Regions:
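Generic signature of intrinsically disordered, low-complexity segments enriched in small/polar residues
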Residues: 62, 66, 89, 108-109
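Glycine-rich phosphate-binding loops that contact phosphosugars or nucleotide phosphates
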Residues: 1-70
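Structural signal for hydrophobic packing residues in well-ordered secondary-structure cores
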Residues: 35-38, 72-76, 80, 109
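Internal, active-site/partner-interface "lid" segment
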Residues: 43, 73-100
Length: 112
């Protein structure tokens, strides 16, 4: 996916662990901006039967991503720009706000 985005001229950001090498290379080496979460390979911590899941790299990467999004939103507000924040459906009025955002950005962002 990163290579496809780069080929299309999109600036890429990767959050990964340098300890794990997949697909014959290191994702962090190919991204324009690379953030190493520093989690060692084999980081699954929850045993489910004979398997392990719940990799700490996932938690670390999502923490990093959310921190970036929060700081970006704060900086936008400080500059007088209201960022389009998708709201939890568990928050009162969240669903209505999200529908308005989906209508505004229809065609640009596909619904999951």
């Amino acid at each position: 996916m990163l290579r496809t985005a780069k080929a299309a001229g999109v600036k890429t950001v990767a959050i990964s662990s340098s300890a794990y090498k997949a697909h014959g290379g290191v994702l962090l080496d190919e991204a324009d901006i690379a953030i190493d979460c520093k989690v060692p390979h084999g980081d699954a911590v929850i045993e489910v039967g004979a398997a392990k899941m719940g990799g700490l790299s996932t938690y670390a990467s999502m923490f990093i991503l959310n921190s970036i999004l929060i700081e970006g939103a704060k900086k936008a507000l400080a500059r007088g720009v209201t960022p389009p924040i998708y709201t939890s459906g568990n928050v009162e009025g969240g669903t209505a706000k999200n529908i308005a955002l989906e209508e505004r950005y229809f065609g640009r962002v596909r619904r999951l």
